[in-house]
Amino acid sequence: RRNPAGVWELTTGGDPLTRGAESGALLRGLMYYQERAFVDQIRRIVPSERYLRFLRSFIVIFNRNLGHCVPEEYRREIFASSRWCSHEFDAIGNAYERQINYHAAHDIGHVMQEYMLVGCSSFATWGGRSADSTLLVGRNFDFYVGDDFARNKLVTFCRPERGIPFASVGWAGMSGVLSGMNAAGLTVTLNAAKGALPTRAATPISLLARTILQYASTIEEACAIADTTRTFVSESLLIASARDRRAVVIEKTPERSALYEGEGEQLRCTNHYQSAAFADDPYNRENIATSDSPYRLQRLGELLDSLAPLTPARAVTILRDRRGLGGRDIGLTNEKSLNQAIAHHSVVFAPERGLMWLSTEPWQAGRFVCYDLGRIFAGEAPPEGRLDLPEEELPADSLFLREDYPRIVAYRRDCAALRQA
């Protein structure tokens, strides 16, 4: 169902086949919409039909063993949901193959970073850096596949047959996790990093995040899962735990992992590695020297200092920030800003309170709706009526919507027209 703020909500549970069949049947129309938006955007990025055919062939060959890298539980879930997919895109592959490959979309985005498909900024505070001393986590998920793709956000509340109940933010057809929190108060968010191009199929990072969210309740358990999973690409996973009352970043490449704990009672994460273990890594050094990631990390530090101690409302202020270092005006949609007006979603977690605030469109400018996981997972079935808490929602950025939003829409419309001219 769709709540009054425009966020789609799915409650599911049980064994993998049941979960997949339920989501496929309920989200059939949305799954088609997301696949159409994704394919259309890829065609805009790669307009050559000849190169698209080559790309399809390459992905088929490269990912031929991808299914073996996905835990059976999730293969069964994805298979069951894929039975409800459209046949319109069968030229790309059958429904199951397509859905498995789409779970590597975030990973593929690493390879296409020059198209600004993948960004992300996240942070966590606790103790004296939080207004009530409890953990607070904020993140922008800047995975840009066009505004149409981000239009229908989906929050899934899953009570699996095995593991811990959890909430995850994504889109229809996505069994993996991009941003989520479980009933034990553990959160997982993903931030792309730079590494060597993948040479063979491995576990998509979103499915590693799903495994952590479903089966870990502490940082130690999350690290153990990450250490034993070979992944496609390099990634930072910000893990916050209510039981540990702190947050860490797991810095992972296909070959190794490292733990970054930061300093003091806060943690920042953008798109490069910060631990000593990767200080001399050539890909990380190049990333620091040539990308906007260090700039955004510095801006995060400025805002965390100036807005401390943090509240959920102040966390949203950080996620919406469009300025550069020192508060300088660097223009709208600048890659150096935390808010580039490309976010698929923006979310704030309060793990010790079991609360999460999710953005509504456009990007992170709409109001943030609030969910109480303790309330949603309290009984055998979800509560009747609305799942969100209207009294806890945070207001929209009305000034931005009135003044800057129309300018961005017009700018992107004009750019699209120029590209087609």
Task: List where the protein language model places each region.
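C-terminus-biased signal that marks the final domain/tail of proteins
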Residues: 1-119, 213-257, 262-421
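Internal mixed beta-strand/loop scaffold within catalytic domains of large alpha/beta enzymes
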Residues: 101-208, 224, 344-348, 356-359
